[in-house]
Amino acid sequence: MSSSKSPYELKDLKNSSTEIHATEQDNEIEYFETGSNDRPSSQPHLGYEQHNTSAVRRFFDSFKRADQGPQDEVEATQMNDLTSAISPSSRRAQELEKNESSDNIGANTGHKSDSLKKTIQPRHVLMIALGTGIGTGLLVGNGTALVHAGPAGLLIGYAIMGSILYCIIQACGEMALVYSNLTGGYNAYPSFLVDDGFGFAVAWVYCLQWLCVCPLELVTASMTIKYWTTSVNPDVFVIIFYVLVITINIFGARGYAEAEFFFNCCKILMMTGFFILGIIIDVGGAGNDGFIGGKYWHDPGAFNGKHAIDRFKGVVATLVTAAFAFGGSEFIAITTAEQSNPRKAIPGAAKQMIYRILFLFLATIILLGFLVPYNSDQLLGSTGGGTKASPYVIAVASHGVRVVPHFINAVILLSVLSMANSSFYSSARLFLTLSEQGYAPKVFSYIDRAGRPLIAMGVSALFAVIAFCAASPKEEQVFTWLLAISGLSQLFTWTAICLSHLRFRRAMKVQGRSLGELGFKSQTGVWGSAYACIMMILILIAQFWVAIAPIGEGKLDAQAFFENYLAMPILIALYVGYKVWHKDWKLFIRADKIDLDSHRQIFDEELIKQEDEEYRERLRNGPYWKRVVAFWC
């Protein structure tokens, strides 16, 4: 449809006459330069000038810096003015979209990296919350934990850590929504809620954790392949997986989210299938061993260790493995800057975490204890000469079930790649956060036009080269070191999240602020955060004891200490170094001095109540199945 109305005559930046037409069909603005030889006869330009740039050129241009220059800002401002001149309601529509959408009710008083693209949808967030973390720790590392603790010790360790995790995710969900405009999420909370030095140390240790996880997962992937073949050099597979992870992340947040959606769907389906098959095998419905029941809880036993002290050490050692296995659950906070609707996505993901803890972790761990004896020589960490494999594969293969173990191993491989993908994505965003906080060189804050922190991604890719040790005879030792750094660092990070939440709530109370300003309130509140914080401090103390006096040994072992507790000296060195450099010796920021406005999204309590009431009304008037889904999800 052509525009027959008389055009408005305005001047553009080039001082040339510009015609602007308002079409009736779609109310879009069409404009082009008058007198230009490039003016099309049938289709107007949607912009000052539309270049027929090739796909290759657009791809390379996407790596250029996303920051707007002064001229670009002027042009963008004038474009908005031109839009308002034609349709005065369009500016109002933009304001409504920006300020009154369901995920942005209230005042945006913070700062974020606007160049990061909001391409992560609620469905992505749900699957990231449910499936991320189902990787090396749960699917492979549990073999070592089962050897050290036995089936009962393994279950106790995961149950304790699961109760802690639920409190952590509730606190994390509350602050992630309030600080949804803060790039890096909880990695930045301690700096302005607790103390700068503490925030600096935790931020760098957490970044180091995910830098270690990527090569750890790639090494694990090569170990998983050994179930099928040992004749091919493991580094060949490392190269393939390394290139795959980098390729996925080249597509930015959308590539990461879509890949995780696929990976996590496969993982959850596999865990569901294993749960069903495991029950069938245990009662004698499949396999060659008939009814198994709880036989392995009696022979070789529920706990590993002749003495009570060794059994206790086994449970403590399991806690670190469990922390690593649960690691990544907090990714819902890292991705808030790239979520399209965090107010809907984050509370739902935090609520559904209980299903992940109970079903994906505790239920399957109970089955592992029923199906795999802790003295199996195929478990990682055992002294036997058997080919090492995931305990989930052993649980099926050792009882004579064929074919299925290959499918399980294939999904485990996907799970490991999923964690490698998540760790690569996270470490790059964490470098970006460190740079924006002034904790790392500014070069890491480079974001290209596609929303990728390009320089930070390069550092993550460089660090992942450690994975090429897979062909080394010290492969399992490298695995142990990387796992220890990652697991203990996770405890530091979770402690920082809970401590930040306690300080945040304390500041809200001291400064007389209403909790109605929060878009989502933790179901466990300050008591849940206090419980989690105290428990993690006790776990760190117990782990220190296990590190200097390993299981089964009465003497001190320096090598074992650094293998299990290396992250602690790093944290202390970073904290003390920051304090000495800045000559700042305060332990906490006073509650009345905490800045509760900067970075924070202040929600309108009345609008939130109105929106929630409208949602409940829709549920009451809707079909019954929607009410059921809303209750559980």
UniProtKB/Swiss-Prot annotation:
Mark the residues modified by lipid (S-palmitoyl cysteine).
Answer: 633
Principal subcellular localisation of the protein = membrane
GO cellular-component terms in the record? plasma membrane
Alphabetized UniProt keyword annotations: Amino-acid transport, Cell membrane, Isopeptide bond, Lipoprotein, Membrane, Palmitate, Phosphoprotein, Transmembrane, Transmembrane helix, Transport, Ubl conjugation
Cite the post-translational modification comment: Palmitoylated by PFA4.
> In which domain of life is the source organism classified?
Eukaryota
| Compositionally biased spans, kind Basic and acidic residues | 92-101
Question: A Pfam family name for this chain?
Answer: AA_permease
What residue spans carry the region label Disordered?
1-54, 87-116
Q: Which residues lie on this side of the membrane: Cytoplasmic?
A: 1-124, 170-197, 253-260, 335-352, 414-452, 499-531, 579-633
Q: Where in the cell is it found?
A: Cell membrane
Ranges that cross the membrane = 125-145, 149-169, 198-218, 232-252, 261-281, 314-334, 353-373, 393-413, 453-473, 478-498, 532-552, 558-578
Membrane-related topology note: Multi-pass membrane protein
What is this protein's expression induced by? Induced by transcription factors DAL81 and STP1, which are activated by a signal initiated by the plasma membrane SPS (SSY1-PTR3-SSY5) amino acid sensor system in response to external amino acid levels.
Q: Which family does it belong to?
A: Belongs to the amino acid-polyamine-organocation (APC) superfamily. YAT (TC 2.A.3.10) family.
According to its UniProt entry, what is the function of this protein? Answer: Broad substrate range permease which transports asparagine and glutamine with intermediate specificity. Also transports Ala, Cys, Gly, Ile, Leu, Met, Phe, Ser, Thr, Tyr and Val. Important for the utilization of amino acids as a nitrogen source.
**Which named protein is this?**
General amino acid permease AGP1
Instruction: Give the species.
Output: Saccharomyces cerevisiae (strain YJM789)
